[in-house]
Amino acid sequence: MNPVILFDSDDVSVDFMKMWLQEINRLHGCGLKSEQIKSWNLMQYFPDLTKEQVFSVLDDINIWQNLNPIPESQKYLSLLHKEGYELYLVTATPYSQCPHKCKRLQQLFAFLDDEHIIISHNKQMVRGDVLIDDGPHNLVYGEYFKILFDRPHNRKFPNDEYDMHRAKGWSDVYRLIHDIFPIK
């Protein structure tokens, strides 16, 4: 059996934070950019907005068409797929947002069908050889090779202490996978 590669959607394969912030900025006159988000607590960056104002923008079905790929994610995921790696997108997306978000993900990643999308808020329960994620909490205690996808909000996390390999971009991810799990 070929290696199973699990990959996250938000801020790993698609630029979720940029899309989300653009909509919040448009609706509420804020000027925040994704590079400024250095923590998982998004609310601290919007002291004048309610949680409802920040999160309800994701309930608009039209927002998902603004979701774009992270640079080189399409290229390298397609290469891995063509080389025979088994690819599964693993997302903690709320169920109500899944139909529209998954439709957009399938438009962006042609190899991704319904059988290769897993919804799980506890990614440690999903089996695979590799997990690529920007959330350290999704990698800690997982029984897979851990690739922490570098983002501003996880840069202070001590990935070396948790046996995680930090990838600065998709070329790093590709190299790490080939170094650890080459397909012959």
What are the residue ranges of the model-derived segments?
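Active-site neighborhood of HAD-like aspartate-dependent phosphohydrolases
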Residues: M1-Q53
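Short, basic/glycine-rich phosphate-binding loops at helix/coil junctions
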Residues: Y45-D60, G84-L87
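Substrate-recognition element of Asp-dependent hydrolases with the DxDx(T/V) motif
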Residues: W64-N68, S73-L105
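A structural signal for isolated positions on well-ordered beta-strands in alpha/beta enzyme cores
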Residues: E86-Y88, V130, I147
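Substrate-recognition "cap/lid" segment bordering the active-site pocket of phosphatases
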Residues: V90-Y141
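Structural recognition of alpha->loop->beta junctions
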Residues: R104-S120, E161-H178
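A short acidic, often aromatic-flanked loop/helix-cap motif at beta-alpha or helix-coil junctions
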Residues: N122-G128, N154-K156, W170-L176
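Acidic, Mg2+-coordinating phosphoryl-transfer loop and its flanking beta/alpha structural elements
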Residues: I132-G169
